[in-house]
């Protein structure tokens, strides 16, 4: 697994520096399809040391088909034009109905995933690299990987634009601060 940077939810905007805030804005722009994400893709593929292997790149389904195409169409085009060793799986997935956006759903790991997609392409025997915007709990990734494997593909790597930073419980933060204060 590779990721390009750390994602801080917008509620922490006042607690992070300008550089991190700029990264988070770029991630939002990627999610909205306003930037292509090619630099993130290239950096993560290089970090994985894929060595020009003939991987099939599949993109994580979104909450609706329009978002899916908008978010990943330029990476799909880049792969087709500039990465002859790779194939794009953009059209291997049919996002057939809308669902609530997972980041908007409260409850984190307790949420029940509603599968709003089906794999329609022939991925039998292909080595798959999954691309997504953000990893938080990994629940949707696990579900997607299982579905890919059920259809005969083998997931060999996953790349994310960002990894959500999780804060430790407030009690642990207070204990660490007070512990250092009491020792000194």
Stretches with model-predicted labels:
Residues 1-56, 94-124, 164:
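Active-site-facing substrate-recognition patch
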Residues 54-56, 87-90, 155-157:
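Residue-level recognition of the N-termini of beta-strands and the immediately preceding loop/turn
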Residues 54-64:
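Short glycine-rich phosphate-binding loop at a beta-alpha junction
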Residues 63-66, 97:
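A short acidic, glycine/proline-enriched capping/turn motif at secondary-structure boundaries
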Residues 65-69, 137-138:
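Loop/helix-junction capping segments adjacent to catalytic residues or to phosphate/diphosphate-binding pockets
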Residues 68-87:
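Substrate-recognition/cap helix-loop segment adjacent to the acidic, metal-dependent catalytic center
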Residues 92, 100-184:
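PRPP/pyrophosphate-binding module of the type I phosphoribosyltransferase fold
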């Amino acid at each position: 697994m590779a990721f390009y940077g750390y994602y801080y939810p917008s509620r922490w905007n006042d607690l992070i520096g300008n550089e991190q805030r700029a990264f988070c804005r770029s991630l939002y722009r990627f999610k909205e399809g306003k930037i292509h994400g090619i630099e993130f893709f290239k950096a993560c593929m290089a970090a994985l040391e894929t060595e020009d292997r003939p991987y099939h790149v599949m993109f994580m389904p979104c909450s609706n088909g329009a978002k899916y195409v908008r978010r990943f169409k330029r990476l799909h085009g880049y792969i087709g034009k500039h990465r002859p060793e790779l194939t794009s799986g953009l059209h291997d997935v049919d996002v057939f109905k809308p669902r609530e956006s997972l980041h908007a759903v409260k409850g984190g790991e307790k949420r029940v995933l509603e599968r709003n997609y089906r794999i329609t392409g022939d991925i039998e025997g292909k080595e798959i690299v999954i691309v997504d915007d953000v990893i938080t709990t990994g629940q949707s990734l696990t579900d997607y990987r299982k579905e890919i494997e059920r259809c005969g593909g083998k997931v060999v790597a996953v790349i994310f634009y960002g990894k959500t930073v999780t804060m430790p419980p407030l009690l642990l933060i207070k204990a660490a601060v007070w512990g250092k204060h009491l020792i000194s």
